[in-house]
């Protein structure tokens, strides 16, 4: 199964594609969609077009996207929601089912700790996908979203289900935490 993860943002939207076979995770591609400094409609159109192109080029079977959180600044929350909507439209237009996970669920599923830092996310995604270099934070979050979806988004079942892949990388789960 091929999964596309999306980390939505108005200026930068991260994407990550992985293949999943049993408990094996394989990196396909990742990157970011950067929007021009332009009016809102142009930026949203860029996100929609970018996501649509990724869906066409990489033919994922499913997609996962981060849920919007309510920010201190309501304007920022509204703009993020619109960027997320443009990305979801691109996914749905490509015929994909879309799952949604909170940032807390994402971090718990990938790192084992819901308050994990961006650096911890990047390190764990790099290990789980056996990458030669560390992806940028937006791409890492998107890859993490795909990993989270691949294992149902549940912390304990995700970490337990990843045990074979983690063991190959010299890691294991202990009391719901990842140890090296």
Curated annotation (Swiss-Prot):
Active site (catalytic residues): 7, 66, 138
Alphabetical list of PROSITE patterns matching this protein: RUVC (PS01321)
Pfam family, one: RuvC
Gene Ontology BP annotations: DNA recombination; DNA repair
Keywords: Cytoplasm, DNA damage, DNA recombination, DNA repair, DNA-binding, Endonuclease, Hydrolase, Magnesium, Metal-binding, Nuclease
Superkingdom, natural source: Bacteria
Cofactor binding mode and count: Binds 2 Mg(2+) ion per subunit.
Record field: transmembrane: none
Subcellular location: Cytoplasm
Catalytically driven reaction(s): Endonucleolytic cleavage at a junction such as a reciprocal single-stranded crossover between two homologous DNA duplexes (Holliday junction)
Residue positions binding Mg(2+) 1: 7, 138
Annotated residues for binding of Mg(2+) 2: 66
GO molecular function: crossover junction DNA endonuclease activity; DNA binding; magnesium ion binding
Enzyme type, top EC level: hydrolase
Coiled-coil intervals, chain numbering: none
InterPro entries to which the protein is assigned, alphabetical: RNaseH-like_sf, RNaseH_sf, X-over_junc_endoDNase_Mg_BS, X-over_junc_endoDNase_RuvC
Cofactor(s) required for function per UniProt: Mg(2+)
E.C. number(s) listed in UniProt: 3.1.21.10
GO CC terms in record: cytoplasm; Holliday junction resolvase complex
Its biological purpose: The RuvA-RuvB-RuvC complex processes Holliday junction (HJ) DNA during genetic recombination and DNA repair. Endonuclease that resolves HJ intermediates. Cleaves cruciform DNA by making single-stranded nicks across the HJ at symmetrical positions within the homologous arms, yielding a 5'-phosphate and a 3'-hydroxyl group; requires a central core of homology in the junction. The consensus cleavage sequence is 5'-(A/T)TT(C/G)-3'. Cleavage occurs on the 3'-side of the TT dinucleotide at the point of strand exchange.
Record-stated family: Belongs to the RuvC family.
Subunit record text: Homodimer which binds Holliday junction (HJ) DNA. The HJ becomes 2-fold symmetrical on binding to RuvC with unstacked arms; it has a different conformation from HJ DNA in complex with RuvA. In the full resolvosome a probable DNA-RuvA(4)-RuvB(12)-RuvC(2) complex forms which resolves the HJ.
Identification of the protein by name: Crossover junction endodeoxyribonuclease RuvC
Protein's organism: Burkholderia cenocepacia (strain HI2424)
Encoding gene, per UniProt annotation: ruvC
């Amino acid at each position: 199964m091929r999964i596309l993860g999306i980390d939505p943002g108005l200026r930068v939207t991260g994407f990550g594609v992985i293949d999943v076979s049993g408990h094996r995770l394989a990196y396909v591609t990742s990157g970011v969609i950067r929007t021009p400094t332009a009016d809102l409609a142009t930026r949203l159109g860029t996100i929609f077009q970018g996501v649509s192109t990724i869906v066409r080029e990489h033919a994922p079977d499913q997609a996962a996207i981060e849920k919007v959180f309510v920010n201190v600044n309501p304007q920022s929350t509204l703009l993020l929601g619109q960027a997320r909507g443009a990305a979801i439209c691109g996914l749905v237009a490509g015929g994909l089912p879309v799952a949604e996970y909170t940032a807390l669920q994402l971090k718990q599923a990938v790192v084992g700790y819901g308050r994990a830092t961006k650096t911890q996310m990047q390190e764990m995604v790099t290990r789980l996908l056996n990458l030669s270099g560390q992806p940028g934070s937006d791409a890492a979050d998107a890859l993490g979203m795909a990993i989270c979806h691949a294992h149902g988004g549940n912390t304990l079942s995700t970490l337990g289900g990843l045990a074979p892949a983690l063991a190959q990388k010299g890691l294991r789960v202990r009391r719901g935490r990842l140890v090296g």
